[in-house]
Each structure stands twice: as structure tokens, then as C-alpha cells.
């Protein structure tokens, strides 16, 4: 399941781009139940980093934990386990938001006129370019009309890719 690109993208976002999170998830899946200290030792990563990742995964409801108190030391031990059955629904929710944004962006690209500064590589709407007298606010260079066909093609490809994943991957069928 973790090899699906959409799932990887969502997990990467959940873990705030911390790639160690994938290693943590793999340890959890392989062990089924493990302490944060054991994960830290196994991956040779600081315990605080492991806990930070686990808390992010817990906030997304992708892991659960049990807490046990050691009567001698009065310290708590947290045993973590994966709870990935909610992952496909989370992916669908986040990807639908991304699809909505991509469709809005595509509509803007299709219905707008844009200008571009070749020196600074900045893109402006017609309205913004007109307000600036068709001059770049950074370098003062002349803004040229921008052909956004490549941008639209890229957005359409992204939309098609996500929709194809939804339609072809059985993980997402019931959502």
C-alpha cells in the first residue's frame, strides 16, 4: 500500500516532509506493535524525532498507542501500532482538495491572459500587468504576453493522473 504515489504524497505531507517517517511506518508495519524507544534504536534516530513523527501520524489517525505505567519508576511506556485502514479515505480527501485546486487553477489559466518578465521569470495576470504599466516590479523590464498552453497541459496531466489513480486503484473504490 505504501508504494502508491498518491499515498506517499499524502504521507509526506502528514509527516511534514520528514522522510524518516516512512522508515517509522515500515518498522510499525513489520513489528505490528513496538515502543517509540525500540523504533529509535532500530532506526538510529533520536527519540524526540521518532516521537514527533508518531504524534503527526497519530493526529492523522494512522497509528494508535497503548500507555502503560511502570510501577517502579512511575514512567509511562508507549507502545505504538499502525492503524492504516483510514489511510485510503485520508488520501481521497486530500486528493479531492488538490483536484479542486487544480481545476480552479486550470479555469484561471483557460480564462485569463498573462504576462511574463523574461529577466525575473515572473508571471502576472493581465490586470496586474496593466496596473504596473506592463513593467516588471522587480527589474523594470517590459512584460511580454505569456503563452500558457504548456501550463494548462501540465495541469491537465496532473488532473488526469489523480483521476486515473482513483479510477484504477481498488484501494480508493469505496470512497
Swiss-Prot record:
It comes from Methanococcus vannielii (strain ATCC 35089 / DSM 1224 / JCM 13029 / OCM 148 / SB). One of its GO terms (molecular function) is DNA binding. Belongs to the TFE family. PANTHER family: GENERAL TRANSCRIPTION FACTOR IIE SUBUNIT 1, TRANSCRIPTION INITIATION FACTOR IIE, ALPHA SUBUNIT. The lineage of its organism: Archaea, Methanobacteriati, Methanobacteriota, Methanomada group, Methanococci. The gene is tfe. One of its GO terms (biological process) is regulation of DNA-templated transcription. Monomer. Interaction with RNA polymerase subunits RpoF and RpoE is necessary for Tfe stimulatory transcription activity. Able to interact with Tbp and RNA polymerase in the absence of DNA promoter. Interacts both with the preinitiation and elongation complexes. Keywords: DNA-binding, Transcription, Transcription regulation. Transcription factor that plays a role in the activation of archaeal genes transcribed by RNA polymerase. Facilitates transcription initiation by enhancing TATA-box recognition by TATA-box-binding protein (Tbp), and transcription factor B (Tfb) and RNA polymerase recruitment. Not absolutely required for transcription in vitro, but particularly important in cases where Tbp or Tfb function is not optimal. It dynamically alters the nucleic acid-binding properties of RNA polymerases by stabilizing the initiation complex and destabilizing elongation complexes. Residues 3-88 form the HTH TFE/IIEalpha-type domain. Gene3D superfamilies: Winged helix-like DNA-binding domain superfamily/Winged helix DNA-binding domain. This is Transcription factor E. Disulfide bonds: none annotated.
Amino acid at each position: 500500500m505504501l508504494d502508491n504515489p498518491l499515498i506517499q504524497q499524502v504521507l509526506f505531507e502528514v509527516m511534514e516532509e520528514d522522510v524518516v517517517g516512512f522508515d517509522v511506518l515500515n518498522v510499525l508495519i513489520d513489528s505490528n506493535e513496538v515502543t517509540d524507544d525500540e523504533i529509535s534504536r532500530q532506526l538510529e534516530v533520536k527519540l524526540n524525532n521518532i516521537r514527533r513523527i508518531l504524534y503527526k501520524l497519530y493526529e492523522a489517525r494512522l497509528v494508535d498507542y497503548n500507555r502503560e505505567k511502570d510501577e517502579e519508576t512511575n514512567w509511562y511506556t508507549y507502545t505504538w501500532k499502525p492503524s492504516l485502514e483510514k489511510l485510503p479515505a485520508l488520501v481521497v480527501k486530500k486528493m479531492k482538495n488538490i483536484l479542486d485546486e487544480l481545476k480552479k487553477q486550470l479555469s484561471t489559466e483557460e480564462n485569463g491572459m498573462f504576462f511574463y518578465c523574461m529577466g525575473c521569470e515572473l508571471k502576472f495576470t493581465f490586470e496586474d500587468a496593466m496596473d504596473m504599466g506592463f513593467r516588471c516590479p522587480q527589474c523594470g523590464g517590459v512584460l511580454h504576453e505569456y503563452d500558457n498552453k504548456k501550463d494548462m497541459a501540465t495541469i491537465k496531466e496532473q488532473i488526469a493522473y489523480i483521476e486515473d489513480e482513483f479510477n484504477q486503484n481498488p484501494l480508493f473504490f469505496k470512497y
